[in-house]
Amino acid sequence: MHCERFLCILRIIGTTLFGVSLLLGITAAYIVGYQFIQTDNYYFSFGLYGAFLASHLIIQSLFAFLEHRKMKKSLETPIKLNKTVALCIAAYQEDPDYLRKCLQSVKRLTYPGIKVVMVIDGNSDDDLYMMDIFSEVMGRDKSATYIWKNNFHEKGPGETDESHKESSQHVTQLVLSSKSVCIMQKWGGKREVMYTAFRALGRSVDYVQVCDSDTMLDPASSVEMVKVLEEDPMVGGVGGDVQILNKYDSWISFLSSVRYWMAFNIERACQSYFGCVQCISGPLGMYRNSLLHEFVEDWYSQEFMGNQCSFGDDRHLTNRVLSLGYATKYTARSKCLTETPIEYLRWLNQQTRWSKSYFREWLYNAMWFHKHHLWMTYEAVITGFFPFFLIATVIQLFYRGKIWNILLFLLTVQLVGLIKSSFASCLRGNIVMVFMSLYSVLYMSSLLPAKMFAIATINKAGWGTSGRKTIVVNFIGLIPVSVWFTILLGGVIFTIYKESKKPFSESKQTVLIVGTLLYACYWVMLLTLYVVLINKCGRRKKGQQYDMVLDV
């Protein structure tokens, strides 16, 4: 006992020293600015900090590749499908078409005897259409439904403690006795909905799968996740490959689709190699039920800065598994399609909300670095502090550099994006990943200020979420983007004014013209390819019924 405690203390000290040393090392490399390669007039340079970032991308891609090889090898691994599984679907003001597709995909799941529990966040007449769709698709004679005035934590109008207790017991009994059940309950947010499903199921099943009501599951998705959990008893949770259902509906959903593939099949695949996936996404995840009930109450009652948390439910659920020392994994063999915002403002609000939960959970996650591989500490430091280094670089270039420095920065952003997307194209076997290089512009222009705004408003959760039946447009997300564009525009004007005081040399003019032409050609080429792709694939997708998950 004393020996284990001593080893734990040593690991805490070791991981803390490693994380601090890594951050100080990166900061020193950034401040010193040592250059390996440097041309005359600083037209091009490659320094220590750039070398570190390049090495990170290479190492991350390598481990992702190795993890995908492991996934392919496990494809032939036979398993006994004798463990009980329950699928929990969280629904809130869902688009009827998406909900119907979701439930139809649930009926096609190949895992035998899977229990389905859908909980609707809201019990008003306006929410009844979701229960009707559930009964229609799952079969009125094969499913149970219940309109609950309460939820497990709040009483409805006119309810007493006794009636609340009786109704809670009725919900639990209904869930346990039915193969498919739909519960409408008093509004309380997604976490309340998930809690109802977890609480009602109790310890009656071995594994709990989570799913959102806008998600279409691949028939083999449950089987593939069960396979991962069965292979290693120290794996507490596993997530699958989330693809975009409405990728051709707008430019923002298309770029999100390539970003999703990169996030899951490079970043999370790399994390999975070390058993420390940071977030098992809500559309497709599975947990050991025995672990789930060790922390479900603490997960529900999570507080931050004195307020109960109302977002970041899936990320905190993953962190709770990691906090117990269990591994979290990713498998590309389990797939699903899910809806993503097609309007820029709704996407921006979504990303801001996700950034809030990321930074909040980063602090919680740091307490468990010592229980996992050093890669978890390493990646947390790199991804957590990278936006701050990037902002410092941009402001410095735009206000203290030259016109060529700004142009070179833009070219470098696209070059790095092209290199990374080219590797992704090879790994996926699909040229569409080349458009990932366009996402880097979206990151620089919108995600970067959204992250800073998320930190500044991290304890505010009164905006950013809406159902899909009624889309709520919130313009507050434009504030940080507008401020960021003003800062950048001011830097460009200041640099041009400063440079205009001295006449450009002939060599400088040539470099600027060539650089501008290269940048313009890049955009013309990518935008042309985008238009061709949308005209070709967009029309085909409009008539597709999505009977199966397709990776196109």
Swiss-Prot record:
InterPro entries: Glyco_trans_2-like, Nucleotide-diphossugar_trans
One Pfam family linked to the record: Glycos_transf_2
Membrane topology (UniProt): Multi-pass membrane protein
One Gene Ontology biological process: extracellular matrix assembly
GO molecular function: hyaluronan synthase activity
Domain of life, source organism: Eukaryota
List of residues that carry Phosphothreonine: 110, 328
Protein name, UniProt field: Hyaluronan synthase 2
Species of provenance: Heterocephalus glaber (Naked mole rat)
Lineage of source species: Eukaryota, Metazoa, Chordata, Craniata, Vertebrata
Gene: Has2
